[in-house]
């Protein structure tokens, strides 16, 4: 996986709640022009759980096409880490095969939610999906949403026994897990999935981030990651601290509710539309977002 900085993309909707494909392409191009290495369509932040199978695949297709046809400032191509998560292994497998066929560089697969599988079930789930494709696979551990964690021993077993399982997105909130994973397998790539811990994870064995805040501030997220990769601890910490209040504000309600509203307030999407059961943020949250964006001079 030849990338380090990436954003977990929101999925913009029109007022009729259909996917706004034109707006989606614009958002991806903004990521490209502001220095991100990769984009992550249709993950948690992309509201994948309320997209149809057809919409899910179309979002991956748009991301691949946009990245293929738009050069970065360094004349390279931004990578696509396609979200293929589902609580049904068969559906994830189908999405994984599609992502590979359409040209995604790698896939991100979350643990099945609601089912609460055993560790053996998780192992078989990930192994089955990974063996159906040739492109790299990133595990995604976010127990607050899935109800079950990929234990360190299970993650290590997957990395050791399934050749194209190359990385894990850590959104467990546990630095202990990060240090254990890195200690036992230095080549197992760890990506931060928790914006408030980006700096800490990068300096505890992490090699990159998948950021929600990056939708709004891709340039600063990219700069922080690049500083960390060069072992510029203090410079990376200064950027992390600069983003502290924004990271906090973007998670006062369930993601992606705040980031979508923030993107709307910043003029980056026309409609802050959500599909039920997600709803617009409270008036208090909107006021907080407005105040925070003013502090960052995103709006006046």
UniProtKB/Swiss-Prot annotation:
Q: Provide the binding site for pyruvate.
A: 45, 210
Q: Which GO terms describe its molecular function?
A: 4-hydroxy-tetrahydrodipicolinate synthase activity
Extract the Pfam families matched here: DHDPS (PF00701)
Pathway membership: Amino-acid biosynthesis; L-lysine biosynthesis via DAP pathway; (S)-tetrahydrodipicolinate from L-aspartate: step 3/4
* Record's subcellular location: Cytoplasm
- What's an example GO BP annotation here? diaminopimelate biosynthetic process
Q: Does the keyword Lyase apply?
A: yes
The job of this chain, per UniProt, is described as: Catalyzes the condensation of (S)-aspartate-beta-semialdehyde [(S)-ASA] and pyruvate to 4-hydroxy-tetrahydrodipicolinate (HTPA).
Task: State whether it acts alone or in a complex, and with which partners, per the record.
Answer: Homotetramer; dimer of dimers.
How is this protein named in the record?
Answer: 4-hydroxy-tetrahydrodipicolinate synthase
Organism the protein comes from: Helicobacter pylori (strain Shi470)
